[in-house]
């Protein structure tokens, strides 16, 4: 389940986004008996407007947006899933978006999977390309319509405050061949990715319903990992 579900058009109408963030906070308290940290709330306040603006400017007001979508059998949450219909095939189509506010990042000890970020000291973080690829793989493994290729699934790491130069090392990750990493420098590219996956003239409610109501069918390896 997502902490907040809304059409892109409705999400844009919430600007300023205080009420949306308040709803997400209430849902988290209701479902998990805990409040998001101040840092997480600040993250929502900075990233949700950027995503909403780009969806609006891309002409995708009919798309359905799932914010903080929880993955099955884990507490991990996907920042956003944009749901709709693929413009070429007519099949359900989903864009998993990992939103980052970082302005710069570099590899940690030449390891493409780990990065250092300004303001976090020497505490390495996972490369967002690896993160979004893992989310897509996990989601597909638990969702038959995705694993059986009845629907489209694409992942994007969107560093909307960064420049290409400031995060150039991150593209050395092998997942750069299959996942997208987009910075604020390439906002047009991000919108083009969205338009290539989501039909602007079709409402995304059906695709979102299909994903949210899908039967969870975890593979044996994932069950073993969860048990461990």
Question: Which role does the model predict for each range below?
Answer:
Residues 215-228:
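Conserved adenine-nucleotide phosphate-binding loops and their immediately adjacent elements
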Residues 1-212:
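Accessory nucleic-acid engagement/destabilization modules that flank
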């Amino acid at each position: 389940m997502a902490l907040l579900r809304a059409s892109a058009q409705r999400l844009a109408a919430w600007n300023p986004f205080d009420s949306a963030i308040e709803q997400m906070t209430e849902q988290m308290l209701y479902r998990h008996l805990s409040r998001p940290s101040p840092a997480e709330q600040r993250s929502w306040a900075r990233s949700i407007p950027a995503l909403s603006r780009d969806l609006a400017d891309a002409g995708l007001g009919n798309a359905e947006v799932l914010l903080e979508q929880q993955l099955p059998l884990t507490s991990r949450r996907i920042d956003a899933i944009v749901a709709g219909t693929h413009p070429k095939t007519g099949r359900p189509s989903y864009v998993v978006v990992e939103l980052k506010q970082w302005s710069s990042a570099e590899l940690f000890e030449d390891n493409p999977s780990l990065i250092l970020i300004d303001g976090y000291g020497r505490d390495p973080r996972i490369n967002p390309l690896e993160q979004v690829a893992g989310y897509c793989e996990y989601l597909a493994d638990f969702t038959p319509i995705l694993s059986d290729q009845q629907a489209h699934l694409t992942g994007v790491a969107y560093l909307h405050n960064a420049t290409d130069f400031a995060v150039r090392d991150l593209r050395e990750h092998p997942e750069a061949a299959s996942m997208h990493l987009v910075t604020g420098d390439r906002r047009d590219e991000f919108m083009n990715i969205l338009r290539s996956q989501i039909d602007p003239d079709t409402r995304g409610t059906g695709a979102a319903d299909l994903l949210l109501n899908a039967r969870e069918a975890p593979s044996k390896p994932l069950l073993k990992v969860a048990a461990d």
